[in-house]
Amino acid sequence: MTAEQALPLGNGKAAEEARGSETLGGGGGGAAGTREARDKAVHERGHWNNKVEFVLSVAGEIIGLGNVWRFPYLCYKNGGGAFLIPYVVFFICCGIPVFFLETALGQFTSEGGITCWRRVCPLFEGIGYATQVIEAHLNVYYIIILAWAIFYLSNCFTTELPWATCGHEWNTEKCVEFQKLNFSNYSHVSLQNATSPVMEFWERRVLAISDGIEHIGNLRWELALCLLAAWTICYFCIWKGTKSTGKVVYVTATFPYIMLLILLIRGVTLPGASEGIKFYLYPDLSRLSDPQVWVDAGTQIFFSYAICLGCLTALGSYNNYNNNCYRDCIMLCCLNSGTSFVAGFAIFSVLGFMAYEQGVPIAEVAESGPGLAFIAYPKAVTMMPLSPLWATLFFMMLIFLGLDSQFVCVESLVTAVVDMYPKVFRRGYRRELLILALSIISYFLGLVMLTEGGMYIFQLFDSYAASGMCLLFVAIFECVCIGWVYGSNRFYDNIEDMIGYRPLSLIKWCWKVVTPGICAGIFIFFLVKYKPLKYNNVYTYPAWGYGIGWLMALSSMLCIPLWIFIKLWKTEGTLPEKLQKLTVPSADLKMRGKLGASPRTVTVNDCEAKVKGDGTISAITEKETHF
């Protein structure tokens, strides 16, 4: 092994030319021909037209449904304002470091979610496969929420919302309009067994839910059409890559903020809103002694920041090499958390109003997840004047929040596949056909969640396939790979070459110690405190249902150890020799900025090397492995 192979830190010009020639199948033609081939390859892969497109695309991906329906609920559940303490701790120690790691890695390598890890450390290429498996699961089930929201939106264009009153064909005798409750009118109904019209609309009209996963039942064709509409919109948002995605996000990433602002203003002007906000923020410091509060804060960071999915790597790979991704990441992380915090005011002001109107404690109306989006909030708007208008705005906001998160996930998966096989998919309309194929396959797989028993399958996907446990597992290996194997100092050199300065040392130590330690602790807590999933805390799945859930969870997590085992098995030599070969970055992974263009001395993982301006190494000290 040569010194140049052991520590590839040069400017990478020759490597870029070689890669461009290889991508296009070229082999000769001299320097001019090679340069032309390289330029053509870069053009074919695409770049963002400007920084705004990148920022809006990332904002659209990370600012999604979880900001509206999960963070406010967790805040009130875990001590109100006191919950912000563990949230900020995880924000600094886990959120920003991993978010920045993935974005910077994509920008430095200009590769998708799999090939970036292959070039940095072949032994840990399984990280890329794990992220794409999680992403594939997400692509199938996340868009189901959009189908539900589209169905609700289609029912908003009436003078009276269909879930506001009883008397429809889907309502039962137990249906009671609580906000207009008159005991003489419901003498035949036991109030303990009564249900609301909004609940019956959700369970009987939308889901037509069966009594268990064992009874899948019929396909809900109306929802199937809504899902088809969602996938059609998603396809045309990304079918031209960054050319189309970069334009669409100007609408999809900004429109939800307009809707959120309108709903916030409306919410805080309602009677009872102040009590709802107080309930949301009132600090209960005693809750900080509960480990579950800290676990909830950590998992919320991972869920809402879209880390460990490969999305940030893919989006960052379309940046210009010298883009200041460090500043972008800090700004986007603050924007994401700020949006979650403000959304809590919009949600809990309305829940406070609903509790005020019904004369019940706010705890009885507070919901999380689909329960908030499709039961609690729709119920609240029925009590407002011009309720169809507010319902329309709310579901439009949900659709746009989910839409850009969905199509960015699909785009990231496509980017990973195309970068693995550039000669195959960067020709003609093959990339567009790949997106079409993935969309069609995901659509038909998703239909099973639109059956009468589909909600039970949806919950399995949500609780296992893309669970916090899977994300934490991937995050541990990402930090180990960059912090220890590739080397945090080396990666800081790469970042300095891109942005012109070195980030705070705190982030480097988070990669090496803090973040993997915290993630490992929460992961173990998950395993120790594991409780089998129950739908609505009532329905218990059969054993084979839990088996399917764990298979989906393991399908991503096992990618990493299996890949390590396979690579070690196939590589020749003793174990130390195998590790040495498999932990060396790709020889053409060069720095392309000012640092890579000038001679200098660099120290990476206790190795000191004299690097010439052409990217070769004139002298190198002992190269140690971290294994």
Swiss-Prot record:
Catalytic activity: 4-aminobutanoate(out) + chloride(out) + 2 Na(+)(out) = 4-aminobutanoate(in) + chloride(in) + 2 Na(+)(in); taurine(out) + chloride(out) + 2 Na(+)(out) = taurine(in) + chloride(in) + 2 Na(+)(in); beta-alanine(out) + chloride(out) + 2 Na(+)(out) = beta-alanine(in) + chloride(in) + 2 Na(+)(in); hypotaurine(out) + chloride(out) + 2 Na(+)(out) = hypotaurine(in) + chloride(in) + 2 Na(+)(in)
Acyltransferase among keywords: no
Residues bearing glycans: N182, N185, N193
Stretches in topological domain Extracellular: 147-220
Primary site of residence: membrane
A Gene Ontology biological process term: neurotransmitter uptake
Protein activity control: GABA transport is inhibited by beta-alanine, taurine, hypotaurine, beta-guanidinopropionic acid and 2,3-diaminopropionic acid. Beta-alanine transport is inhibited by GABA.
Swiss-Prot/TrEMBL keywords: Cell membrane, Glycoprotein, Membrane, Neurotransmitter transport, Phosphoprotein, Symport, Transmembrane, Transmembrane helix, Transport
GO terms of molecular function: amino acid binding; amino acid:sodium symporter activity; gamma-aminobutyric acid:sodium:chloride symporter activity; taurine:sodium symporter activity
Cytoplasmic face of the membrane: 1-53, 567-627
Bilayer-crossing regions: 54-74, 82-101, 126-146, 221-239, 248-265, 301-318, 330-351, 384-403, 433-451, 468-488, 509-528, 548-566
Membrane association type: Multi-pass membrane protein
Tissue specificity comment: Brain.
Sequence segments annotated as region (Disordered): 1-36
Residues modified to Phosphoserine: S21
Entry GO CC: cell projection; GABA-ergic synapse; postsynaptic membrane; presynaptic membrane; synapse
Pfam families: SNF (PF00209)
Family: Belongs to the sodium:neurotransmitter symporter (SNF) (TC 2.A.22) family. SLC6A11 subfamily.
Function: Mediates sodium- and chloride-dependent transport of gamma-aminobutyric acid (GABA). Can also mediate transport of beta-alanine and to a lower extent that of taurine and hypotaurine.
Record-given protein name: Sodium- and chloride-dependent GABA transporter 3
